[in-house]
């Protein structure tokens, strides 16, 4: 089967990412790796690779590229698409489509066997003392209660999902940042969306 040098580079990059991380790269990452600035050009090469039976794509999902001739496919971890939530609509289930920004292909083992999980991308440095950095994605098990001191994702008065350490105190709830420069959030009522059970960080 004849493919171009560029298509070979793209195919090898996808294969190496799947083997190393357990999930495929994004179109942007593919473009950066092979020197293509146009996402439409990358899509064109992917379409040709798919037409030649080397990959299979799911157009309804991001990053959904499957290598069809990966020799050690049995060793590749299973991937689950985890919803990444953004602004939370009050009164809606946390994983309602209105709340989901995108889906992230997480290796199944990182979900720790949990089925009701979602992810939240951390914006800012409010949890740096807990080792949670700006740009990290926390893995969250859905639950509506927490024990004092647990790291949770809760809803603020502005309907934004925030990651903080939870405390129930005498007359209020305290959402405590893990950053000495920031003040806690004090609330009369709090809606807990889930408990943080893991973290994903892209070190590139």
Swiss-Prot record:
Disulfide bond residue pairs: none
Catalysed reactions listed for this entry: Hydrolysis of Ala-|-Gly bond in repressor LexA
Example GO BP: DNA replication
Keyword DNA damage listed: yes
Gene Ontology molecular functions: DNA binding; serine-type endopeptidase activity
Residues at the site labelled Cleavage: 90-91
Keyword hit for Transport: no
Active-site residues, record numbering mapped to chain: 126, 164
Annotated DNA-binding residue span(s): 27-47
EC number per UniProt: 3.4.21.88
Pfam families assigned: LexA_DNA_bind, Peptidase_S24
Family, per entry: Belongs to the peptidase S24 family.
Record note on quaternary structure: Homodimer.
Function as written in the Swiss-Prot or TrEMBL entry: Represses a number of genes involved in the response to DNA damage (SOS response), including recA and lexA. In the presence of single-stranded DNA, RecA interacts with LexA causing an autocatalytic cleavage which disrupts the DNA-binding part of LexA, leading to derepression of the SOS regulon and eventually DNA repair.
Protein name: LexA repressor
Organism whose genome encodes this protein: Listeria monocytogenes serotype 4a (strain HCC23)
Higher taxonomy: Bacteria, Bacillati, Bacillota, Bacilli, Bacillales
């Amino acid at each position: 089967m004849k493919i171009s040098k560029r298509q070979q580079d793209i195919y090898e990059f996808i294969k190496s990412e799947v083997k190393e991380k357990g999930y495929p790269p994004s179109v942007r990452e593919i473009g950066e790796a092979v020197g293509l600035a146009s996402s439409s050009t990358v899509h064109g090469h992917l379409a040709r690779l798919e037409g030649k039976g080397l990959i299979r794509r799911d157009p309804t999902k991001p990053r959904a590229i499957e290598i069809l001739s990966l020799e050690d496919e049995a060793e590749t971890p299973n991937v689950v698409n985890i919803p990444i939530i953004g602004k939370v609509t009050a009164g809606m289930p946390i994983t309602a489509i209105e709340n989901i920004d995108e889906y992230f292909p997480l290796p199944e083992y990182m979900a720790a066997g949990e089925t009701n999980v979602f992810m939240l991308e951390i914006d800012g440095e409010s949890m740096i003392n807990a080792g949670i950095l700006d740009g990290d994605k926390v893995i969250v098990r859905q639950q509506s209660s927490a024990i004092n001191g647990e790291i949770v994702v809760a809803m603020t008065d502005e309907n934004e999902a925030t990651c903080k350490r939870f405390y129930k105190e005498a007359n209020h709830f305290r959402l405590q940042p893990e950053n000495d420069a920031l003040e806690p959030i004090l609330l009369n009522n709090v809606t807990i969306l889930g408990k943080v059970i893991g973290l994903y960080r892209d070190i590139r």
